[in-house]
Amino acid sequence: MNYENYIHNLFVDDEIFKYSINEIENQHEISFYIRFGSVLYNLNHDYGSIGLRKMVDYINSEINQDITLKEIKQIIKFFKLICHGMIISYKITFEYYKCLLKYDDIVFINSCIELADRNPLDLERFEEIVINKKNG
């Protein structure tokens, strides 16, 4: 049985269906990064950058996924921000969160997430608004 067609028939509006599917996909992606961030955070805490470099090598060679040390550090920062009170919205993708990783002000970050949560914006427009909001 094609569950996507079955689920689609439950919805009258195509936009609601697409929105719901996107939210489920975002939830899976963000949940993965939270769990992965937890592992990386502990690895970094216990072994420092040597452990992170070994993790990068392991992922690239054994799991056959291209990942850089920079991406690993972004995921750790994402996890740390959650630990310090950053809210999670499944209405936006991880790419939106990556725009906010350069900031440390949780109140500012949460206000940006709430803005994106209320008003769906494309990523480029979101980045513009974040920069303008921070500067003025």
Residue ranges of each PLM-predicted region?
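Helix-turn-helix/homeodomain-like alpha-helical modules used for DNA recognition
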Residues: 106-136
